[in-house]
């Protein structure tokens, strides 16, 4: 005897569907031809439904009532007089309500063959437009298109608050050839929470956050969130045009590194983060006044653990919830641009954490990471390393970089931990790593990815800056890719940072024996396009603040810090300084609390802040400090060998017609009067800056703002002058009026 079930279903398909074991759901559910093309059949699975009617969307008329096949929620029915498929909705009667549901199983695939090809090849730049949760319209019906890459899963479902997290309700369409699963869901609203429910080959079920989610819940929750339809309206056309026309390697670039969660806080106990509107009103004016050209944001992709500072992101495409939504972030970037401030994003592409809702063994296999821990696990952080050899993983990362630059108008990316990407034996002992195909230690796949990444981004986004945190002597980090370089625009100068901070911590009495720590960097300054960085890493984990590193009493500490900044701003290369360092934060950085802004009630801290501000403004005003940063003609030592006095003198040159600037830095507390220095031009000179000025908290030793050149050759120059060099001070001297012929 034929039952209702086997009248509409075949070969136990109904049982498999109920148990969540039927994967080819589009061949079963939805509207299909029946009776050799003489009728249509509609099948659906709606738990707890009492009755289901089929309603034509075109005219709103009821077409048929479906039979209830069983009590679990299977419904089916034949539409005898209809032979051509049409758009319909299901009018569902539940015990407490009636709902109209547009059946998702009536729609064809929305994937584009070109997108699929580029994604698998590893060259997709817009994968986020078809993967993840995207608002789409098809056949006049609006909904959310869900798509995820999980080639080794037996079944993937979308679960969320729109289906009571029922894994059997919305099983996705499988594309066997490329491992993609998709489902177009009408009746989903903005802000809906969702995840992907995956059945592994071993039968285990796991729910995962969407790797391409553009919004996520705050920890400890980890659902992905359907994004809003409304988008920010940009007003930064002037900035974007200026950016595209700027050669940043010849322009002033002074970046202020910011951790948004601890720059400043609000609330009675400082327990609340500033939101993006607060940051627009407070951070941007501060950065502008201080003279920084850029803000560099520490990572803002969603991360569950505050203590990771964002360097262990789980939602690489989702701006963290901590400071607002994506449109709020866009408004913040827009406001930066309208204020003439560039904004760089710290981007983590070297590794990802093992949080179970994240990428780790995403479909039951090592999908994003390497199977072998000798290549797939990072020993320092117990995280996982991306498999850069896999096309889909390269597309995931390349598209993410493009996403931040295209959708959020960021002006560049600073790549974290590049050294760990370049070397297979990074932080590993012999036997703990696998050599490349040629027996070497270089990670050839990662190198290739970085080259492609930089090449693509510089082509697609004119004027962006790609910056590498790279701590080894790997050759060609900032060389073009057609010269076998990695193609970055800038590289952090970790050697200069380590040497100079080591020198800073030495007693002035013994600095004469370590003079080379401030001069050696000029031996290799032009091998790469360096950025001098004093980042968050130097003021945390017991290292203490910059002030804490410096020996002596308070007066000596502040004077030394000002002189150090003078040396840094005079040294060739772009600049980066971590927040709080600009006013002499005393405690090392704590990500759980605001900077110690109360210190600005005290004059020494005001003085350091004012000095840094004046350095920045001079840096922007004088081309000599930037236009030839990466040309040997832009720098000349006057005296790099005066280790006895620990005095450093050098000249910075611009192009023809630009005023040269002379720097004199004294790193001992000894006052020097009648100290002769060579000068590049004849005539009167102006003391542009003196870190020992009273306005900066100094002892007011100097040259009363004026220096007069004499026709007495000195230090390779035809002109020279006798000056007063203040203790632990920095002087910046330049022509007072006009320019004569340089020597």
Curated annotation (Swiss-Prot):
GN (gene name): glgB
Single GO BP term: glycogen biosynthetic process
Protein name: 1,4-alpha-glucan branching enzyme GlgB
HAMAP family listed in its UniProt record: GlgB
Free-text function comment from the UniProt entry: Catalyzes the formation of the alpha-1,6-glucosidic linkages in glycogen by scission of a 1,4-alpha-linked oligosaccharide from growing alpha-1,4-glucan chains and the subsequent attachment of the oligosaccharide to the alpha-1,6 position.
Annotated organism of origin: Shewanella baltica (strain OS185)
UniProt subunit comment: Monomer.
GO terms assigned for molecular function: 1,4-alpha-glucan branching enzyme activity; cation binding; hydrolase activity, hydrolyzing O-glycosyl compounds
Active site (record annotation): 416 (nucleophile), 469 (proton donor)
Keyword Glycosyltransferase part of the UniProt annotation: yes
Keywords assigned: Carbohydrate metabolism, Glycogen biosynthesis, Glycogen metabolism, Glycosyltransferase, Transferase
E.C. designation(s): 2.4.1.18
Record family assignment: Belongs to the glycosyl hydrolase 13 family. GlgB subfamily.
SUPFAM superfamilies reported for this sequence: (Trans)glycosidases, E set domains, Glycosyl hydrolase domain
GO cellular component terms attached to this protein's record: cytosol
Top-level lineage group: Bacteria
Catalytic activity of the protein: Transfers a segment of a (1->4)-alpha-D-glucan chain to a primary hydroxy group in a similar glucan chain
Pathway participation: Glycan biosynthesis; glycogen biosynthesis
